[in-house]
Amino acid sequence: MTNMRKTHPLMKIVNNAFIDLPAPSNISSWWNFGSLLGICLILQILTGLFLAMHYTSDTTTAFSSVTHICRDVNYGWIIRYMHANGASMFFICLFMHVGRGLYYGSYIFLETWNIGVILLFTTMATAFMGYVLPWGQMSFWGATVITNLLSAIPYIGTNLVEWIWGGFSVDKATLTRFFAFHFILPFIIAAIAMVHLLFLHETGSNNPTGISSDTDKIPFHPYYTIKDILGALLLILMLMLLVLFAPDLLGDPDNYTPANPLNTPPHIKPEWYFLFAYAILRSIPNKLGGVLALILSILILVLMPLLHTSKQRSMMFRPISQCLFWILVADLLTLTWIGGQPVEHPYIIIGQLASIMYFLLILVLMPTASTIENNLLKW
């Protein structure tokens, strides 16, 4: 009799995705981040669910309810900090996952890549709305500044902002709807992630060489299940080190001050994982221009397949492109640093140069380098 896992309608799906899936024999640890993102999402949904049991989405009680969770709820503090730092781990995994995709040419799988970009946008929206919920100073002013960017849209901008706010400023209505959206979006992310996986399994995984691995496949289980478990253990170790030893390391002290519309914090800045985009936004001295640059800084990922001029898929055997890739990584780290600095000399000019460099690298230098490499190999 055939094994039940190969015949049962539900188990068959699991089997074909996680057990008998033919996987390339040479995928490195950079391929671990997909499963780690899945673990992060499950962890965020679970901790978020338990937080929602004690949280109240009203401006008068939101801040107090978070304090209540940390002080009075059994293990509330650990749930709260796992959720907050879990978001940071989520974005670390996201950036690594996208970086892997760029380096090894995974964007050639168009559907998988584009759904991935949609997932990135959705996750960023979810994280932004989650940051507003504790209703601290940075929550309130972050929400005010970011939602206000929509007013740069010609003609409908102001109406749009007031529609999102549910009034004439960030207030009760805004907090309530942000909580509702923050609750529902992770489930939408989970659904889109399923589609992401579905399209990936149509083609099979890419591998470090960028060459077809159809002639050299191994079963996902036990090889990559055990490898994923190791990755998961390391992820949980990193998360718990943060949660138990430095829970506020990545947070902003201003968020321990209740929201006050009459008092603006000296430096309004988002969580660390948005700082690179925030730096690009601030580097353009025009509101609409800044907003467009902000959106384009992420949306540029959609153009990657069009900007691929190399005859090789991966950067594994392309030293010039490798150098440019790591310069891009350094540039993003520079932007992240600048995003957290006050708007004054020399930070303004550094931010502007880093922003120009970001778009120049992706749109001009990397495609040019690929063409040069093609010619060097006399192709």
UniProtKB/Swiss-Prot annotation:
Record's keyword annotation contains Transmembrane: yes
Broad class of the protein's primary localization: mitochondrion
Gene3D superfamilies: Cytochrome Bc1 Complex, Chain C
Membrane topology, from the record: Multi-pass membrane protein
Ranges that cross the membrane: 33-53, 77-98, 113-133, 178-198, 226-246, 288-308, 320-340, 347-367
Location in or out of the cell: Mitochondrion inner membrane
Family: Belongs to the cytochrome b family.
Protein name: Cytochrome b
Species, as recorded: Kobus megaceros (Nile lechwe)
